[in-house]
């Protein structure tokens, strides 16, 4: 059987190249060769924090644009040679959770997240995609692969944070954390019609992109509690929506304190470090302050990717601003991942161009 090479989590705290048998293509599936890849902080959590437990020789990665190398006999909408956007989340669309409107949670909590979780990820010379007609999107001719790869997870997750926050025309919004996902939440808030947008962060390159994406105010968490700064800036009114895209467990307390009655706190941040999320009882009205909490996992699937791609085509978003480091050659995946782990101050997102 044919072999292929991929960059893998060999075990907790160890990564390396592995050789495996080429995955089989099911009747409704596809085999993809990557054109553009991007490491994610989730890959770092997986390997060096044990976020999903131990894995042996599991190929990493879930952000990809590629070219169709093989299709199953029942695939109708794609052919060999098509360039496609691959969502990070590839649900089982016939599952009960998908039919209830929660495709990211198919077969169980976070079950739509298959790449580098339940099966090998996209950092391989080839990789498998289930239900190709529902989980692939054609790459528009005028969109570059390295631009589109920012849609797989970053924009899909960040904009979900804004969608879940119930932002209305003129809403005042706070986005806590302006790494790549938080920056996409800023862009999402602006596209949904927010008025004033507070962006909480300090790194100059991220602050610059936050302003480009629509932030009206920058809050420096080093200058004091962010809830106090935002309450002062809003004459003690607070905000209509809070999107948590960074920070720590204390961030939740600050989010509740800055939230108005009727607001939504929308979380897109991976929670680590403690089993219990603390909420300030009094500020939350003893649990009765009409401050809701919304959570979600990156939306996936074909329609999601097509709609995000249309935002690029018609000038609503500019994902290229997220890309600070470019690598050429598939073998540079390792360098890109280690850059993500080291997190230099000038980094937002790295991209690997595989050709």
Describe the predicted segments one by one.
Residues 1-4, 253-256, 301-355:
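C-terminal hydrophobic helical "lid"/dimerization subdomain
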Residues 1-65, 124-127, 131, 137, ...:
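Short N-terminal strand-loop motif that marks the start
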Residues 23-37, 50-99, 120, 140-142:
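Glycine-rich beta-strand-centered segment in the early N-terminal region that forms part
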Residues 84, 138-223, 228:
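Mid-domain Rossmann-like dinucleotide-binding core that forms the NAD(H)/NADP(H) cofactor-binding site
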Residues 85, 240-243:
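N-terminal Rossmann-like NAD(P) cofactor-binding module of classical short-chain dehydrogenase/reductase
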Residues 92-176:
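NAD(P)H dinucleotide-binding glycine-rich loop of Rossmann-like/cofactor-binding domains
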Residues 194, 211, 248-316, 354-355:
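Glycine-rich phosphate-binding loop and adjacent beta-alpha segment
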């Amino acid at each position: 059987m044919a072999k292929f090479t991929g960059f893998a989590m060999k075990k907790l705290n160890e990564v390396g190249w592995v050789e495996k048998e080429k995955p089989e293509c099911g009747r409704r599936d596809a085999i993809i060769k990557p054109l553009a890849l991007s490491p994610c902080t989730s890959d770092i959590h997986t390997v060096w924090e044990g976020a999903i437990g131990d894995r042996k020789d599991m190929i990493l990665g879930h952000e990809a644009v590629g070219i169709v190398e093989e299709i199953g006999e029942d695939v109708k909408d794609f052919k060999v040679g098509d360039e496609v956007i691959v969502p990070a989340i590839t649900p089982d669309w016939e599952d009960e959770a998908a039919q209830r409107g929660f495709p990211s949670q198919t077969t169980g909590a976070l079950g739509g997240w298959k790449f580098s979780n339940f099966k090998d990820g996209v950092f391989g010379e080839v990789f498998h995609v289930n239900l190709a007609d529902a989980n692939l999107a054609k790459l528009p001719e005028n969109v570059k692969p390295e631009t589109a790869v920012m849609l797989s997870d970053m924009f899909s997750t960040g904009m979900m944070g804004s969608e879940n926050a119930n932002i209305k025309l003129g809403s005042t919004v706070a986005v806590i954390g302006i790494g790549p996902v938080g920056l996409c939440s800023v862009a999402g808030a602006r596209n949904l019609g927010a008025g004033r947008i507070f962006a909480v962060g300090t790194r100059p390159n991220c602050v610059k992109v936050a302003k480009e994406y629509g932030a009206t105010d920058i809050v420096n968490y080093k200058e004091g509690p962010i809830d106090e700064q935002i309450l002062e800036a809003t004459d003690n009114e607070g905000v209509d929506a809070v999107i948590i895209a960074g920070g720590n467990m204390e961030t939740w307390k600050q989010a509740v304190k800055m939230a108005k009655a009727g607001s939504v706190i929308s979380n897109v941040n991976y929670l680590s470090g403690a089993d219990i999320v603390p909420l300030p009882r009094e500020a939350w009205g003893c649990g009765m302050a009409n401050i809701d909490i919304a959570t979600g996992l990156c939306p996936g699937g074909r329609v999601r990717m097509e709609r995000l791609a249309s935002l690029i085509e018609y000038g609503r978003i500019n994902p290229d601003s997220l890309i600070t480091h470019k690598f050429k050659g598939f073998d540079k995946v390792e360098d890109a991942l280690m850059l993500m782990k080291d997190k230099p101050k000038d980094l937002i997102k790295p991209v690997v161009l595989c050709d």
